[in-house]
């Protein structure tokens, strides 16, 4: 889906939540640290969810 093409977005808050995003350049789901707010749809709690939605 189109959310898989959105850029990684950490957000403006200072939390530290381990998440995954789909890297459209590599075609893989990659871990990153999410700040807790102001993110976008390319933000998954699990690797499985990222792979299932983005077909990685």
From Swiss-Prot:
Intrachain disulfide bonds: 4-54, 13-37, 29-50
One function term, GO molecular function aspect: ion channel regulator activity
Site (Reactive bond for trypsin): 14-15
Residues of the BPTI/Kunitz inhibitor domain: 4-54
Database matches in SMART domains: KU
Alphabetized Pfam families for the sequence: Kunitz_BPTI
Record-linked InterPro entries: Kunitz_BPTI, Kunitz_BPTI_sf, Prtase_inh_Kunz-CS, TFPI/VKTCI-like
Function: This recombinant serine protease inhibitor inhibits trypsin (Ki=30 nM). It possesses anti-inflammatory activity in vitro. It blocks histamine influence on intracellular calcium concentration in murine bone marrow-derived macrophages (62.2% inhibition at 10 uM), which can indicate inhibition of H1-histamine receptor (HRH1). In contrast to some paralogs, this protein decreases reactive oxygen species (ROS) level in the oxidative stress agent 6-hydroxydopamine (6-OHDA)-induced neurotoxicity model, but does not show cytoprotective activity on neuroblastoma cells.
PANTHER family: BPTI_KUNITZ INHIBITOR DOMAIN-CONTAINING PROTEIN, KUNITZ-TYPE PROTEASE INHIBITOR-RELATED
Protein family per UniProt: Belongs to the venom Kunitz-type family. Sea anemone type 2 potassium channel toxin subfamily.
Record's protein name: PI-stichotoxin-Hcr2n
Species the sequence originates in: Radianthus crispa
């Amino acid at each position: 889906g189109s959310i898989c093409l959105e850029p990684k977005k950490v957000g403006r808050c200072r939390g530290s939540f381990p998440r995954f995003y789909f890297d459209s350049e590599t075609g893989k789901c990659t871990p990153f640290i999410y700040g807790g707010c102001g993110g976008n749809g390319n933000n998954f709690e699990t690797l499985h969810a990222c792979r299932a939605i983005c077909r990685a």
